[in-house]
């Protein structure tokens, strides 16, 4: 998984670009995490606690949520949790694939630590 973080010096906004299949992680960092260091620390603590566990932990966001389970971090659009998703036609399948992404705890932990370091610096 490749990614790049940037800050717009004109308006102070952050940008997180991720490789194909992981784009939603960048959106989640921008929209749901931002510069919330307490949230980042909580997530990192949960990853550490779940590394040798079969338990699940969820962080529900406004539009996107994080699920930690089975040694994977899953970022998912909240609308996918609803039963209404079955009502979407087959043309929406590709869009759904862009609305969920997962990676292992180790990779996700590195991404979150890199984001934390980036927003601390800038």
Curated annotation (Swiss-Prot):
TM region(s), chain numbering: none
Signal peptide per UniProt: none
Pfam families: UPF0231 (PF06062)
UniProt record similarity statement: Belongs to the UPF0231 family.
HAMAP family found in the cross-reference section: UPF0231 (MF_01053)
Protein name according to UniProt: UPF0231 protein PBPRA3187
Organism: Photobacterium profundum (strain SS9)
